[in-house]
Amino acid sequence: MKALTSNVSKALPIGATLQCVDNTGAREIQIISVKGFKGVRRRLDVAGVGDLVVASVKKGTADMRREVVNAVVIRQKKEYMRADGLRVKFEDNAAVIITPEGILKGSEVRGPVAKEAADRWPSVGSAASILV
C-alpha cells in the first residue's frame, strides 16, 4: 500500500452504503469501520477513494450476505482535487472486496477506477478496465 498523491476529500462515514462492483457475489456493502483512521473523540470514521474499509455485505448472493469483509473504495460522488488542480467526481460510491493480504478477491472490476486507488492497490489497478 502506497501513500496517496492527492488530498482526497473523505466523504463516506460509518454506515454509508457502497456498490460492490466486482464479481464476488456481493452487490451492496455498508461501512463498519475505516482501517488506519485517526480522529478525535466521538468523531465518526470517514473514508475516501483508496481507503481500506471493513464492511458488511447487505445485498448479494445468499452465501455472501451478512459477511464481514475488507474492501477498497474506488469511486466516490464527492469531488476531490488532484495535485495538478483537476477536480474528480464519479456518479456513484463504489468499492471492491479484497483479501486481508491486499489481493483482489474477484477477477474483474466493473466501471471506472480512480487513479489514486489503482496506484495504492496494484491488484485493483491491474483488474480495472478503465482508469480515471
UniProtKB/Swiss-Prot annotation:
GO terms for cellular component: cytosolic large ribosomal subunit. The keyword Lipid metabolism does not apply. PROSITE patterns: RIBOSOMAL_L14 (PS00049). CDD domains: Ribosomal_uL14. One of its GO terms (molecular function) is structural constituent of ribosome. The keyword RNA-binding applies. Keywords: Ribonucleoprotein, Ribosomal protein, RNA-binding, rRNA-binding. GO terms for biological process: translation. Part of the 50S ribosomal subunit. Forms a cluster with proteins L3 and L24e, part of which may contact the 16S rRNA in 2 intersubunit bridges. Belongs to the universal ribosomal protein uL14 family. PANTHER family: 50S/60S RIBOSOMAL PROTEIN L14/L23, LARGE RIBOSOMAL SUBUNIT PROTEIN UL14. Binds to 23S rRNA. Forms part of two intersubunit bridges in the 70S ribosome. This is Large ribosomal subunit protein uL14. It comes from Methanobrevibacter smithii (strain ATCC 35061 / DSM 861 / OCM 144 / PS). The gene is rpl14.
